[in-house]
Amino acid sequence: MGFNTNLKEQVITFFSALSLSKDFFNFIWIAFSILILLLTITIGVLVLVWLERKISAGIQQRIGPEYAGPLGIIQALADGFKLLLKEDIIPSKGDNWLFNIGPAIVVIPVFLSYLVIPFGHNIILADLNIGVFFWIAISSIVPLGLLMAGYGSNNKYSFLGGLRAAAQSISYEIPLALCVLSISLQLSNSLSTVDIVEAQAKYGFWGWNVWRQPIGFLAFFIASLAECERLPFDLPEAEEELVAGYQTEYSGIKFGLFYVASYLNLLASSLFVTILYLGGWHFSIPFLLNSNYLEWVFSHGSNQVINIIIGIIIVLIKSYLFSFIAIMTRWTLPRVRMDQLLDLGWKFLLPIALGNLLLTASFQAFLL
């Protein structure tokens, strides 16, 4: 994670003056970057949980969290602390190894997906050439953890929830990948998240992929909601049918890990929508760029710290706007049936994503 190349060189010089090896500095720098990323993700998830509670309360004409901190902002922290104090119950006739390892298999891949998310041109832990496909590939491990959790619980509801999660993931990963291929084919010829953002920046606000790939954006939006397993696509944990799905036998910190993974996945999906379709950290809205204050800020671009802070704020604003849409969708639409879920993925989204890819390829061939 290169916050500032010049800053990194200055720190290397400082460590060299202390007679410390460059390898030791690189280790410290990587550890520090990972720590900052984990802290940022944690704060982002806490804010997202608070936003969902407040938005859902507003929709249902309630007050929502109010007493745990100002406006109830630390309510999620209080809930997490409560889960830490609860007893960890393990089913007597279940597979203990699968039951214990399942939550970790669910959370770890979601954390790893943040490695390829850029918050600025140099603010990324791993700028891979296959960055977006890395996210899709690593996300496909999550249903395995859900299946392990369901099978290890020795509970029919848990097992059915795990099977539903696997079927849902397979159904919607293919349209997701095809939408990403369309973006790579049309603009950047690269799957690097940084390259995709920079390719959009060349054409300003109207160069965002949401305008160039409207069909792909719609398919990606629906598929990402299904991958997050949120209403109307929360079939793996449907309360009316499966009690709590794969979470039925879990309690304490392990139940909390599933809860955290759900919001981590939503935040990651929102960030990827921002990177792939909304121009990333670039602020390209014309009528706002004409304001005197923003003119002054961008004219002082020599200060890289200001640019970094502005880029992070822009990415977060765009991401939370998408999260707001996802939250509104959850609290306003009813749950679909399992057959409707699979039909939507295989009979609607997959042909649309394939047609969008074919249309993009034909357009590129015509330009050549």
Curated annotation (Swiss-Prot):
It is a multi-pass membrane protein. One of its GO terms (molecular function) is oxidoreductase activity, acting on NAD(P)H, quinone or similar compound as acceptor. It is found in: Plastid, Chloroplast thylakoid membrane. Its EC number is 7.1.1.-. Keywords: Chloroplast, Membrane, NAD, NADP, Plastid, Plastoquinone, Quinone, Thylakoid, Translocase, Transmembrane, Transmembrane helix. Disulfide bonds: none annotated. GO terms for cellular component: chloroplast thylakoid membrane. Its main location: plastid. It is an enzyme of class 7 (translocase). The chain crosses the membrane at residues 27-47, 97-117, 130-150, 269-289, 308-328, 348-368. It comes from the Eukaryota. One of its GO terms (biological process) is photosynthesis, light reaction. PROSITE patterns: COMPLEX1_ND1_1, COMPLEX1_ND1_2. It catalyses: a plastoquinone + NADH + (n+1) H(+)(in) = a plastoquinol + NAD(+) + n H(+)(out); a plastoquinone + NADPH + (n+1) H(+)(in) = a plastoquinol + NADP(+) + n H(+)(out). NDH shuttles electrons from NAD(P)H:plastoquinone, via FMN and iron-sulfur (Fe-S) centers, to quinones in the photosynthetic chain and possibly in a chloroplast respiratory chain. The immediate electron acceptor for the enzyme in this species is believed to be plastoquinone. Couples the redox reaction to proton translocation, and thus conserves the redox energy in a proton gradient. Belongs to the complex I subunit 1 family. NDH is composed of at least 16 different subunits, 5 of which are encoded in the nucleus. This is NAD(P)H-quinone oxidoreductase subunit 1, chloroplastic. It comes from Physcomitrium patens (Spreading-leaved earth moss). The lineage of its organism: Eukaryota, Viridiplantae, Streptophyta, Embryophyta, Bryophyta. The gene is ndhA.
